[in-house]
């Protein structure tokens, strides 16, 4: 009998004893349940890529309830690329984690195991409703163009579909409770434990030296989730534009859809261009530089009012308030924009402590304007769409409507025929307790002491013009962390950066790129905290740079020097910690 077959046939009661026997055979030490791993790095016989296909992962090796996991495919992939794009040879493993509920879908996952391993692992988060496996050969969000991918650096990289297979993102999977729990976070632990089981088998080591998580949007929420719930598993996390408290966020997204679904309230692309250009005319120079980027956001939001704003000396409000064409905004459109800009009260409290949706910086965003940028189509979809919201929702409508529609119909109301645009966000009536319950499942813990105390480090980043996941939500989360843990303690293990002009994952104004993984590695592994960082624009004005300012600071032009160089800017508006 082969070692793999013998291992797979072990009953649970003999697992610990069998692992001690495996130590004598392979010099590998495991710990039951896959959550604690020992420090021994003894010589051992690793399994080959093809041998992994025969490995079965027992349920008791996974830290949350499953019926175990299997490897469904393995593939030896040759080295490719050159320079910073080089990726060495690796073993690509596909697997499935089986549910307790036989009607629930599997969690499908992939794992890339490089031949030249750096003894570190990276998990990638997903996006939207998940439903497909992120590429394990990809890079961290907003990575520098010349930054090697984690796999290229030698990381073992893994990711999953979070427990359902639906890349179209309807949200229908949430009618199954186990699938819902997986999406809200449980799949992350199950994927991590299953992947590390295979890492140990392939490399014949007890544990990786360091473990990192990286994601944006839903992946950013997932990054916060793992360090809140299982901090012992992780050393560093990248959480960019995180869609944390998904239940509250989708209510805000629905409010946006409802505002623009009102009669004649939705502004087309040309009208959005009028609004954006008026905001630039009023606010661009507030940071000292007329560079097409509104950096002094707080001052802009204080002084800019579309109802009275001018563009080239002409009011952008249509004469008399009626819609007279694409050169102005009607009163109905101005009212919808103001409704989206302003907070929305909840006449109930969520488990996160939230009593309102905080609104969006809609006045200063490229909401999908006439623009030759190759990113404009996706920016349009993620902002206000190319058609007004209506029921039933279509893919041409704003992404907020698409996400919130599926969440309301399937997850909250459990009625596929329910018109989501009739849902009362402020007062859900009979659905209030359901909304509160769903919020309780999410990443809403502001006390990250366990993660901080073990030396974990967190990088947060958000764009000031995000219309999909409101910037104000991340500001709120960070402020609650400070209230809970204390400002200095938070600063000892985390950094939060705001990027002026950046939208959601993509931007036509300022699309940031920086070597965030290297910064995180240096902080975690060498104790060198990020300082004086520079971020590069890869779309708006290709190659221009700005200082990456720590919240609440923003880049202010010094008054002289190259307007496209970070050296000509200083981070202004910092709090009492001083400018960083």
What spans do the regions from the language model cover?
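Cap/lid segment of the alpha/beta-hydrolase catalytic domain
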Residues: 118, 127-205, 251-252, 417-431, ...
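Glycine-rich nucleophile elbow surrounding the catalytic serine of serine-hydrolase chemistry
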Residues: 215-225
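Bacterial N-terminal signal peptides
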Residues: 22-37
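N-terminal secretory signal peptides that target proteins for export/translocation
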Residues: 1-20
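Short beta-strand/loop motif that positions the catalytic acidic residue
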Residues: 460-462
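A catalytic-pocket lid/entrance helix-loop region that shapes and gates access to the active site
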Residues: 225-227, 232-345
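Catalytic-loop region of hydrolases
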Residues: 42-120, 133-138, 143-145, 276, ...
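Alpha/beta-hydrolase fold nucleophile elbow
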Residues: 206-216
């Amino acid at each position: 009998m082969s070692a793999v077959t013998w291992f797979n046939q072990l009953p649970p009661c003999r697992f610990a004893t069998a692992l001690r026997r495996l130590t004598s055979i392979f010099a590998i030490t495991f710990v039951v349940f896959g959550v604690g791993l020992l420090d021994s790095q003894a010589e051992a016989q690793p399994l080959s890529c093809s041998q992994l296909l025969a490995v079965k992962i027992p349920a008791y090796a996974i830290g949350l309830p499953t019926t175990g996991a299997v490897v469904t495919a393995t593939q030896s992939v040759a080295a490719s690329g050159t320079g910073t794009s080089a990726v060495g040879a690796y073993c690509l493993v596909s697997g499935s984690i089986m549910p307790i509920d036989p009607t629930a879908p599997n969690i499908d996952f992939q794992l890339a195991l490089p031949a030249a391993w750096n003894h570190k692992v990276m998990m990638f988060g997903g996006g939207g409703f998940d439903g497909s496996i992120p590429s394990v050969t990809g890079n961290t969000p907003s990575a520098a163009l010349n930054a090697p991918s984690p796999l290229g650096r030698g990381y073992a990289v893994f990711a999953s579909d979070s427990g359902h297979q639906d890349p179209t993102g309807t949200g229908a999977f949430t009618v199954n409770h186990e699938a819902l729990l997986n999406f809200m976070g449980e799949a992350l632990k199950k994927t991590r434990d299953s992947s590390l089981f295979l890492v140990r088998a392939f490399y014949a080591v007890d544990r990786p030296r360091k473990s990192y998580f990286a994601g944006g949007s839903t992946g950013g929420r997932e990054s916060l989730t793992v360090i809140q719930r299982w901090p012992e598993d992780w050393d560093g996390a990248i959480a960019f534009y995180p869609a944390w408290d998904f239940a509250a966020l989708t209510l805000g997204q629905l409010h946006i859809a409802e505002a623009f679904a009102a009669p004649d309230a939705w502004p087309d692309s040309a009208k959005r261009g009028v609004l954006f250009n008026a905001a630039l005319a009023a606010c661009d120079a507030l940071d000292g530089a007329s560079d097409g980027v509104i950096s002094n956001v707080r001052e802009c939001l204080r002084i800019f009012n579309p109802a009275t704003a001018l563009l080239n000396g002409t009011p952008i409000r249509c004469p008399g308030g009626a819609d007279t064409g694409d050169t102005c905004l009607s009163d109905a459109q101005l009212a919808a924009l103001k409704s989206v800009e302003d907070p929305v009260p909840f006449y109930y409290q969520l488990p996160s402590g939230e009593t309102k949706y905080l609104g969006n910086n809609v006045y200063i965003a490229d909401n999908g304007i006439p623009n030759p940028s190759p990113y404009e189509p996706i920016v349009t979809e993620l902002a206000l769409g190319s058609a007004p919201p209506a029921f039933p929702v279509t893919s041409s409508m704003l992404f907020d409507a698409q996400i919130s529609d599926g969440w309301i119909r399937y997850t909250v109301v459990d009625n596929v025929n329910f018109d989501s645009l009739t849902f009362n966000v402020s007062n859900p009536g009979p659905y209030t307790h359901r909304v509160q319950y769903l919020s309780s499942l999410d990443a809403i813990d502001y006390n990250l002491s366990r993660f901080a105390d073990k030396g974990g480090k967190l990088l947060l980043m958000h764009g000031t013009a995000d219309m999909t996941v409101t910037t104000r939500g991340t500001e709120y989360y960070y402020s609650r962390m400070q209230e809970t843990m204390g400002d200095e303690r938070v600063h000892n293990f985390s950094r939060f950066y705001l990027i002026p002009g950046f939208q959601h994952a993509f931007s036509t104004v300022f699309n940031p790129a920086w070597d965030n993984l290297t910064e995180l590695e240096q902080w975690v592994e060498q104790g060198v905290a990020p300082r004086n960082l520079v971020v590069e624009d890869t779309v708006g004005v290709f190659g221009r740079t700005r200082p990456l300012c720590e919240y609440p600071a923003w880049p202010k032009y010094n008054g002289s020097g190259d307007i496209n160089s970070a050296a000509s800017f200083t981070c202004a508006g910092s709090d009492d910690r001083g400018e960083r």
